Regions:
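Hydrophobic N-terminal alpha-helices or hydrophobic patches in metabolic proteins across all domains
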Residues: 1-280
Length: 280
């Protein structure tokens, strides 16, 4: 029941406490990357360093957790895992960021809020642009993180966030060539989680619209762009249909309802897998 315990405690803590600054953990990751790069930059290419860093971090974290659990006490290894997952998985903070969109005129005041700009990532800090990217951003912050936690543990979720930050944040300075390669890698990494997210949307919303949107989305510009376009098309078409059927409902409430119901669907399936013995 380790998976269930970590997930439950992480979600409870994230729901109870106000948003906690990630500056400390992000600083540690940044310093670790600089040290890692300093050791290998004369040996291998920068692109390979960027690829190997999350892999090396994943191995080191799991090694540390194993040593702590064996030498000290398993409870402390549980705490380390919980801290990492708490840092990675933030559905409630994502919902809070959507709530901030209620005041369209105040969007400019959030441009220096790193937590908001990371979760509501868009090319411009404009209401319509942010809305158009909500569903893809939800996969970055919630669904793909959950998927890699289930597959690889909290360290796997953290490694995914690092790869995501290469593309979607300014923490790491990446040249155009490396970013193009990393987008191809990220496209492969995100493919299954986004397919599962689309399926969850179909289960909790209008199945027919999801199928039509899925079939109409073509893979013409690479897997990374296909993933973004697919989840955006499916989500936005569901929103349009919901608003048309419920003309009095608040637009942002529709977004939040779809995301909340789909995440509950994920949690329900996870519980079934846990009781089925697929996760410890």
């Amino acid at each position: 029941m380790l998976t269930a315990s970590l997930l439950i405690f992480s979600l409870i803590l994230e729901y109870i406490y106000e948003p906690i600054s990630d500056k400390g953990i992000n600083s540690i990751i940044q310093k670790s990357f600089e040290s890692f790069k300093g050791i290998l930059e004369d040996i291998i290419t920068k692109t390979l360093i960027l690829f190997l860093f999350p892999v090396a971090l994943y191995i080191l974290i799991n090694l540390l957790i194993s040593i702590v659990g064996f030498v000290v006490h398993p409870f402390f290894s549980f705490l380390i895992n919980l801290l990492i997952l708490f840092h990675c998985l933030k559905p409630n903070q994502f919902r809070a960021c959507i709530d901030k969109l209620e005041d369209k005129e105040a969007l400019e005041t959030h441009k220096n809020n790193k937590n908001f700009t990371r979760m509501m990532k868009s090319s411009k800090l404009i209401y319509e642009e942010i809305l158009s990217q909500i569903f893809y951003n939800s996969t970055r912050i919630i669904y793909t993180v959950t998927f890699f936690f289930l597959m690889l543990g909290p360290a796997g979720a953290l490694s995914y966030l690092i790869v995501d930050s290469y593309i979607n944040e300014s923490t790491f300075k990446i040249d155009t060539k490396s970013k193009k390669i990393l987008k191809n890698i990220l496209g492969v990494i995100e493919f299954i989680p986004i397919q599962l997210t689309v399926l969850s949307f179909a289960l909790v919303s209008d199945f027919e619209i999801c199928v039509k949107s899925y079939k109409s989305t073509k893979n013409e510009e690479g897997l990374y762009n296909y993933n973004r376009t697919l989840i955006t098309n499916v989500g936005n078409n569901l929103v349009d249909q919901s608003i048309e059927n419920l003309s009095q409902e608040n637009e942002l409430d529709v977004y939040k309802n779809i995301l909340s119901r789909s995440f509950l669907a994920w949690l329900s399936v996870i519980v079934l897998f846990i009781f089925g013995g697929f996760f410890i």
